[in-house]
């Protein structure tokens, strides 16, 4: 890739990673222009320091899973959090026009990052933070046909998203593979 960049075939080289230690090594290597890493309002202090490290090394930071793979249901919280890190470019994972409209409105009228917002974020952190599945699907395909991201997050999906689809006969058959 470095050779292709020198020849002008590509302009930038980026890396995507889910492991903080590997991501830190990539930043410190000086070989990459961007880092794509899971980052949202439930990110811990280590993830925030990683984002700051990219800023300090003049490296782009792309926040994947800005809504934690759909587990953060209040877009305002993560939007307000992201605005505290203006060098971070989030990938929101918008799937519907209504979601696009919500983010366009948030961009026009950003919510305050106040004590109320911080309390909502802290509630999400207590429920979701830690080593949990972000739903990226990097673990797929499973040789046994198990939908690993759904299985790993099922208890959260049932509580934090419209649950009816998860209770179908088809989904029950999928979960019986586990």
Q: Which residues does each PLM region occupy?
A:
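Glycine/proline-rich, positively charged
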Residues: 1-62, 67-70
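Structured C-terminal cap/extension of enzyme domains
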Residues: 49-178
